[in-house]
Design a protein with these regions (language model features):
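Short, glycine/acidic-enriched loop or turn micro-motifs at the edges of active sites
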Residues: 19, 85-87
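Nucleotide/phosphate-binding catalytic cleft detector across ATP-hydrolyzing
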Residues: 1-79, 94-176
Length: 176
């Protein structure tokens, strides 16, 4: 139980883009671990990376944590591709600064949108099709999303490298 591991936890850091999750984890941290958590993305949370984005804008805590971890593990000149609800591309320069990125719909979100917004299209799971050209609706949808995402990732990474005019390492993470 949580009470049995209480003595082993002295600090808590929360990184979530879902307000309800942040709230619940704060309550859990306070109630079971008697500690006030650090919430990434809140004004009182200092991160060990320079965030260079337009004034008045915010970067999701998941993206900041990815950038800090990526830089710590692999250094600068890094593109971090996170496959989640959204597919994000975050860029860390040679000095370790977060310099921006790209947000695209996630793989499963795209499949869900096809099913929900196009009445005749069924729900399908992501799968690598045997051939690019599908011969039924499910195979066509799977091909479009599977190969479309490969194209999306390759092209966005290529354009970032072209724009930065530097060699970049590419790191993939996420849970789809």
């Amino acid at each position: 139980s949580l009470q049995n591991i209480k003595a082993d936890i002295s600090d808590v850091i929360i990184s979530s883009t879902v307000p309800r999750v942040v709230f619940n984890l704060r309550v859990l941290s306070d109630r079971y671990f008697n500690t006030r958590p650090i919430v990434v993305g809140k004004p009182d949370c200092k991160v060990p990376i320079d965030v260079r984005v337009d004034a008045g804008t915010a970067v999701g805590p998941d993206r900041i944590v990815n950038s800090v971890a990526g830089y710590d593990l692999f250094g600068g000149n890094l593109i971090i591709v996170d496959f989640g609800t959204a597919t994000t591309f975050d860029v860390v320069d040679k000095d370790g600064a977060y310099v921006g990125g790209v947000i695209a719909p996630g793989v499963n979100l795209s499949l869900q949108a096809l099913h929900q917004m196009a009445a005749a299209l069924p729900h399908v799971d992501i799968a690598r099709p045997k051939e690019v050209i599908g011969t039924n609706t499910v195979a066509c949808m799977q091909s479009g999303v599977f190969w479309g995402y490969i194209g999306l990732v390759k092209e966005i990474c290529r354009k970032i490298i072209e724009e930065k005019q530097e060699g970049m390492k590419i790191l993939a993470t996420g849970g789809l």
